[in-house]
């Protein structure tokens, strides 16, 4: 079963096998990169006679940025605040953010999972990392991996809630873009 | 007739196997030690097979037929990028290795795309040094048809693999086509996928049999394993080569992994028991692979004798 609401793939010519296999490849790659839950609808259009490969997707609601209280517990201690880290994955980003806000001399790490800040303002709402930017980076990586390798001319338009990716062997002309947009609209309305 | 087999067992007492094979007049093609395990690729006279089977049972080893032993197969992908590797190409290469062949993976510089795919003279020559080549293509039938130009000039049998089913007449330059193994992003683990790998091995085996049959019509002056044995004995430096297989066997010769300029004369001077020198019965030339030496044994029609 697809975890996405809509996942349509259309390939021109007698390429049913290719369509079926590309469906598997897309699912495998999105699953590998942990992106599958963030994509709501996906439309893939391939015309092998041109040849061109296009993907249009709608994203699920935005991902909030990761703050200090998401990665650890903040407590008031004598002389400042202590953060007990629960999720070590973002440790590097956390330290970077704390150094930037408070300065290196006021951030101390007495143990692997404990950081003490010599400051009266609690760091709870300080942003550790922008998850959305990371997600968009991963998504671009996934699209480049999914598209057949020879399709080196690429165009990728990303908005807050959608992305539109075209890859082709020859240069991408405006007529081609509008033609593909038309095809994808047809797929959406079908 | 010599039978190609693979022995897998413990390192302990494996020298008994080596001794027996030598006593029987067989050849040791490859010896791979992995910690306490050993994998031996052997050529054993078929009438004495029983003796080896008994010994391997005593040593609790496993003896299986390796139909591709003594051959070198190229597994060619359009490039070495993530789109083609690791799953399909590596699994195919590994599966061929399990059946005894020496497999080399070759990624082309500009093999990608439908209209823009190219192969150059060097790549063609390198693939031609093998006994057979497996070209790994993708999921679109149209592209597989168009990419024919990549292997049109290759003189060794070419086995094409790809996703969709294709008609034989669509690929006139290929020896055979194995469907249902196009591009994929997961490991080959399902029974159907393994069966496809079996089909590739079977097809490669058939291609090699065809080459063997062609060779028997004009037999080689001497057999490649014999050349290997003589080189190993008379050019001891070959044992110090860092390559896992210092002398790779082909159906019509061997590749010796030593620098060409330094060792070509020493190799030509290798003498057989009959008094014949290797330089008289084979051409010795630089291989396209690194700085290695390529030995191609001449057929009896050129030398006038077989020994």
Which residues does each PLM region occupy?
Chain B
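Short amphipathic alpha-helix segments
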Residues: 8-29, 52
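Long, charge-rich C-terminal accessory regions
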Residues: 92-95, 99-263
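Conserved short beta-strand edge segments in small beta-sheet-based binding/regulatory domains
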Residues: 5, 27-33, 54-75
């Amino acid at each position: 079963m697809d975890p996405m609401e809509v996942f349509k793939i259309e390939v021109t010519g007698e390429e049913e096998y290719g369509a079926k296999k590309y469906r598997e490849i897309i699912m495998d790659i999105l699953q590998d990169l942990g992106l599958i839950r963030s994509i709501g609808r996906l439309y893939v259009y391939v015309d092998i006679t041109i040849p061109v490969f296009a993907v249009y997707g709608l994203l699920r609601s935005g991902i909030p940025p990761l703050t200090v209280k998401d990665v650890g517990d903040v407590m008031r201690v004598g002389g400042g605040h202590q953060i007990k880290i629960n999720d070590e994955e973002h440790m590097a980003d956390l330290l970077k953010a704390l150094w930037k806000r408070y300065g290196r001399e006021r951030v101390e790490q007495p143990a692997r999972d404990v950081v003490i800040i010599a400051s009266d303002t609690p760091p709870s709402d300080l942003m550790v990392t922008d998850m959305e930017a990371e997600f968009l980076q991963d998504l671009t990586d996934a699209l480049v991996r999914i598209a057949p390798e020879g399709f080196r001319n690429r165009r990728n338009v990303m908005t807050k809630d959608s992305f539109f990716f075209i890859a082709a062997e020859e240069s991408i002309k405006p007529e081609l873009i509008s033609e593909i947009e038309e095809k994808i609209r047809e797929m959406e309305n079908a | 007739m010599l039978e190609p087999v693979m022995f897998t067992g413990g390192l302990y007492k494996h020298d008994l196997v080596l001794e027996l094979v030598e006593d029987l007049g067989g050849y040791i093609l490859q010896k791979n030690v992995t910690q306490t395990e050993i994998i031996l690729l052997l050529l054993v006279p078929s009438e004495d097979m029983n003796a080896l089977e008994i010994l391997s049972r005593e040593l609790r080893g496993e003896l299986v037929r390796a139909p591709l032993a003594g051959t070198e197969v190229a597994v060619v992908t359009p490039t070495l990028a993530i789109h083609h590797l690791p799953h399909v190409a590596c699994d195919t290469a590994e599966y061929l290795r399990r059946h005894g062949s020496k497999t080399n993976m070759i990624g082309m510089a500009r093999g990608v795309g439908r209209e823009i795919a190219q192969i150059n003279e060097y790549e063609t020559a390198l693939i031609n040094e093998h006994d057979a080549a497996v070209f790994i293509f993708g999921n679109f039938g149209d592209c597989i048809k168009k990419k024919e130009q990549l292997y049109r000039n290759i003189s060794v049998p070419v086995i094409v693999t790809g996703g969709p089913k294709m008609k034989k007449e669509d690929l006139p330059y290929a020896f055979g086509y194995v469907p249902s193994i196009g591009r994929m992003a997961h490991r080959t683990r399902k029974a159907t996928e393994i069966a496809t790998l079996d089909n590739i091995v079977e097809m490669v085996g058939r291609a090699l049999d065809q080459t063997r049959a062609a060779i028997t019509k004009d037999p080689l002056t001497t057999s490649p394993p014999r050349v290997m044995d003589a080189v190993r004995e008379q050019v001891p430096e070959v044992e110090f080569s860092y390559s896992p297989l210092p002398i790779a066997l082909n159906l019509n010769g061997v590749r010796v992994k030593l620098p060409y300029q330094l060792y070509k004369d020493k190799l030509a001077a290798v003498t057989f028991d009959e008094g014949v020198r290797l330089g008289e019965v084979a051409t010795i030339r630089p291989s396209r692979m690194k700085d290695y030496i390529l030995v191609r044994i001449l057929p009896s029609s050129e030398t006038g004798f077989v020994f």
